[in-house]
Amino acid sequence: MMLVAAIPLAVAGCGGGDAGESATTVRVERPPFNADRAFQDLERQVAFGPRIPGSAGHAEQLEWLETELRSLAPTVFLQPFEHVTVDGNELALTNVIARFGPADGSRLLLLTHWDTRPKADQSSDEADRELPVTGANDGASGTAVLMELARMFNEQPPPGGVEFLFSDGEDYGPSTTDMFLGARHYIAGVGSENPPAYGILLDMVGDADPSFPVEAYSMEGAGQVVQRIWGIAADLGYRRFFPMDQTSRVLDDHVRFIEAGIPVANIIDFDYGPGHGFWHTPGDVVENTSAQTLFMVGDVVAEVVYRNR
């Protein structure tokens, strides 16, 4: 993801999708979100090493994702693809997709990226800028939350169709030409032939000092989805952590979906560390993440799924 610019937001009068108050509300009792297990998944991913396309850690993570999801979801399939970077590097990439319930056009898409940044290009120390990013928050956190949600849905099926997309190649970079690759490939394939109704993107959702203000592109292109998510967060007592206030434009996977006419809102904490100093730096490590933050985000998304379909 990349920061674009800061702009003020108005809460009222926002468009973007039909996932708001007009949706049928069906309340289904649900199991609790297991934060300890989710955090163990975050630690497991970090233990694989950097999950850069072509690396051993990337291959191990892919195997783990597929194996774990096949034990949980009725339908799991891989979406392999290739990409040649602006520098001429050939990347072998794979999206992992899992489905619960009907795969029709009313389904909700939950997505995150599972790859990590090849270089810590935002480090203040020039000597560190060639190092790979560990990706405890930027890569592992969203994946950990979705994996635990998959376990919940296996135990108690959601009241409607839900699709998981673990996208690859989101963070390769450094230019946007070589980013958001998995989202683009999904949209050109599954998302074109059988698009979901709307979606929720999780990115950088493990910060130990969390705050999830509304991201600007999300409000503009998926305003009703935003209203639902942030409203439920307030209902659950998380209003302080999900403020409806000014935010920035963040280029991320959700923008590609919005451009394709699919309203996707981004839950993202883009103020990671003092002075945003942990993003794309060696500071993106397990010690700067929190199981409690994973719980809060997982609790909100689970409630969206089980309450509002």
What is the role of each PLM region?
Residues 10-13:
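C-terminal motif of bacterial Sec signal peptides marking the signal peptidase cleavage site
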Residues 16-18, 28-31, 44-103:
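A non-catalytic alpha/beta surface segment that caps or lines the substrate-entry region
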Residues 26-32, 46-57, 83-87, 129-140, ...:
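Second-shell loop/turn segments in exported
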Residues 30, 35-48, 72, 94-155, ...:
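Catalytic-core environment of secreted peptidases
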Residues 37-47, 60, 64-71, 141-148, ...:
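Extracytoplasmic/secreted proteins, especially bacterial periplasmic and envelope-associated proteins
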Residues 52-53, 82-85, 103-104, 114-118, ...:
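Solvent-exposed loop/turn segments at secondary-structure junctions
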Residues 130-224, 228, 232, 249:
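Acidic/histidine-rich catalytic neighborhood of metal-dependent amide-processing enzymes
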Residues 198, 207-309:
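Active-site-adjacent substrate-binding region
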